[in-house]
Amino acid sequence: MSFIAFAIFLFLTAVAGLHVAWGTGVRWPCKTETELVSTVVGHRSNKMPTPNQCYLAALAIYIPGPIALMLAGLIDASVTASTIPLAGSAAALVFLGRGIAGYLPAWRERFPREPFATYDRLYYSPLCLLLAAGFLILLINRPGT
């Protein structure tokens, strides 16, 4: 379970880092803001979210990473015994919801731009479903359960 927890942590840390970079104005992996919006945001506007929105997204993406490590018993948490599985369950549900949302027509109407729509269907949503599965595996196999 350590491998799964560490993989989740590293992946979410990297994705959170990208969101921080975008908040500071970095356009990687694209050249222009419009291209970046089309690739990673997908809404109709040509403007990236504000820096604060990028930073908030980065924080929301990062937080489940240490939770995965706690679920695997790799880091100690100074919280009640029920808090970590509750947080892990919440993370699993959020990733499951985001993963499913990417395949719904209402989501596609809200985020129709290409190549985001294709990337979302092929990569972003499946990755969210994989993260949800990882959290479920960690929850089921928690040390001491």
What residue ranges belong to the model's regions?
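Alpha-helical transmembrane segments of multi-pass membrane proteins
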Residues: V15, A91-R98
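Interfacial loop at the N-terminal end of multi-pass membrane proteins
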Residues: L18-L56, L74-I75, E109-P115
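Feature marks short, highly hydrophobic, charge-poor N-terminal signal-anchor/signal peptide-like helices
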Residues: M1-A7, T145
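N-terminal signal-anchor transmembrane alpha helix
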Residues: A5-T24
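Transmembrane alpha-helical segments of integral membrane proteins
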Residues: R98-P112
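Core segments of transmembrane alpha-helices
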Residues: P51-L69, L127-A132
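Juxtamembrane boundary at the C-terminal end of a transmembrane helix
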Residues: L71, F135-T145
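Individual transmembrane alpha-helices with interfacial aromatic-anchor signatures
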Residues: I84-A90, E114-L131
